[in-house]
Amino acid sequence: MKQDTEMGEATNGYIGTPGTVPVSHAGNDSGMRRMRTASILMRLTAMALCVTALVTMVTDKQTHYFNFASTTIVKTAEYTNVLALKVFVYTNGVIAGYSLLQALWTIVAKSSYSTSKARLWTTFFLDQFIVYVLIGVTGAATEVAYIAEKGESDVAWPKQCNNFGRFCSQVGASVIVCFVAILTLVFLAVLSAKQLFIHERPSRTTRKDGYYTSNQ
């Protein structure tokens, strides 16, 4: 009788066949709802930032006239002239689309616990992947902007921003916006990892050494 009483107290009044006793997800649900809301807002923010960086780069164009004696040479600077900047634009477009789709999927999901394990793992890996990809692409664009601004004497590359100042300024603005997007995506990667951890964590009360203990 004494053991039954102790077992009953340990399980909040449950006395019955030893085994697994389900407990409420109320506490976890509240936290998951907050993370779900934060995830939606941050994904929409990341999408907006990536689109802003993309549009800023795509609309960046400047023409300069070089006069040599009686000859005038016209040169136009735009993102399509540099492979790194083209990859920058394409990558931001893909990540913006991914962020929008993930936000919409999260909105239509009925609850955090109804989300499949496979989707949580997929989201976790994709969120990590796009952060690394965007860091690499933005780093390459930053290097291009730096060389255009400072030149590279070792390979006799002259400065270009003296002639295309507005173009360089707009490239810099696009890169800065993209770095803010990276910070947002890093936060999302941490958030998706936490959501996966909570979903995978046992949320049942199990018997151990004759007593019922919670795994939460």
Swiss-Prot record:
Stretches the record annotates as Disordered: 1-30
Keyword Transmembrane: yes
Membrane topology: Multi-pass membrane protein
Coiled-coil annotated residue ranges, if any: none
Residue ranges, Cytoplasmic side: 1-37, 108-128, 192-216
A GO cellular-component term linked to this record: plasma membrane
InterPro entries to which the protein is assigned, alphabetical: CASP/CASPL, CASP_dom
Keywords: Cell membrane, Membrane, Transmembrane, Transmembrane helix
Transmembrane segments: 38-58, 87-107, 129-148, 171-191
Organism superkingdom: Eukaryota
Family statement drawn from the similarity comment of this UniProt entry: Belongs to the Casparian strip membrane proteins (CASP) family.
Protein name: CASP-like protein 2U1
